[in-house]
């Protein structure tokens, strides 16, 4: 017990602040939201999904990563709120040795990076579906499994790469905090994540545009046109998800950079007052299953409306061709 290190008065002041408690409660609501909507997202992907098998595998991986991040964050939040509400009057609030937090941090960052790398994996899969001829079930399955394994390996090793030469000799209030001697690298990591998110957004737009251009090169036969529309719809969904991820990652990366730049000017209290609100990763994780459900249902509803239009309207052959062309635009 003699080697135990206690929280400083600044850390205690941060824990007892109303701003901190509100932010943690909001994060906790986002965590519950993620878990709740993930259950429905899995059902929607399985039963009402236009995605190919490889896309489904990678969507499962993205949902898994989002929930890993939220679960480990949730454990930390419960511990923090327990201290904030019930233990602030204790003589010593013990800090955790960074060596004891290594595995916890690696899992936490694996979930975070898995969401970012997973989007890149989805775009790689969409590129395969676009450019590989005869992208049948076997190729789709192999692409999905191999890509998801690569994403999981990369995300699982990210934290270890960042802290590889850190002696882990300090103490932290929570295991989700970066080791003190690796914080510069962690800032660089989030900047890279923002760049990757921007890259994903640009590539998704290019793939979507390419598919739309090639749509009319497909013979006007229901089967091939329907499959091409599936590729366009699924790519549009990935583009939609990537856009929101980029917005949230940019807010976090730029916010942390800006606050870090002016930290000495605004002081410790103001820095931590604002930094909890620019941590947007829980919003990324919570929005993913919600937006995914929305896009899948939107696509299915749109298709049903098109089919009803075709079956309820009497047309000449020329009118039918014109309407079909408008639908595929």
Curated annotation (Swiss-Prot):
Give the subcellular location: Membrane
Q: Where are the transmembrane segments?
A: 25-45, 57-77, 104-124, 144-164, 187-207, 238-258, 273-293
Which InterPro entries does the entry mention?
7TM_GPCR_serpentine_rcpt_Sra (IPR000344), Nematode_rcpt-like_serp_alpha (IPR051080)
Lineage, top-rank taxon, reads Eukaryota
GO BP: any one term:
detection of chemical stimulus involved in sensory perception
Membrane topology per the record?
Multi-pass membrane protein
Output the Gene Ontology terms for molecular function. Answer: G protein-coupled receptor activity; olfactory receptor activity
Where is it mostly found?
membrane
Among Pfam families, the record links this protein to: 7TM_GPCR_Sra (PF02117)
| Keywords assigned by UniProt, alphabetized | Membrane, Transmembrane, Transmembrane helix
Asked if Membrane is a keyword of the record, the answer is yes
Q: Which GO terms describe its cellular component?
A: membrane
Q: Respond yes or no to whether keyword Transmembrane helix is given for this record.
A: yes
Q: Which family does it belong to?
A: Belongs to the nematode receptor-like protein sra family.
**What name appears for this protein in its UniProt entry?**
Serpentine receptor class alpha-3
Q: Which organism is it from?
A: Caenorhabditis elegans
Q: What is the lineage of its organism?
A: Eukaryota, Metazoa, Ecdysozoa, Nematoda, Chromadorea
